[in-house]
Amino acid sequence: RRKKKAEEAAIRRRVRLREGIEGEISQLEYKISHIEKQMCLPENISDYEYLERLGEELAEAKKQYEEKLEEWMNLEENS
């Protein structure tokens, strides 16, 4: 009985963790899309400093996205 409860608790933890990671992935996808749209706006094309800042933000968001995606895939493989 204790073993079953422990297994159920572990499953619930993995589900919560997976849902949290999926939420973070979704937020990062939105952030990446938003930054890319900002970079394409005509009023921003000639503002090189702003574009550079956006480029740095985009690179960081993509890095975080890849890390979260890898974390999610590892979690799926071990479920």
What does each of the following model-derived ranges do?
Residues R1-S79:
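Charged, heptad-repeat coiled-coil alpha-helices that serve as long linker/dimerization "arms"
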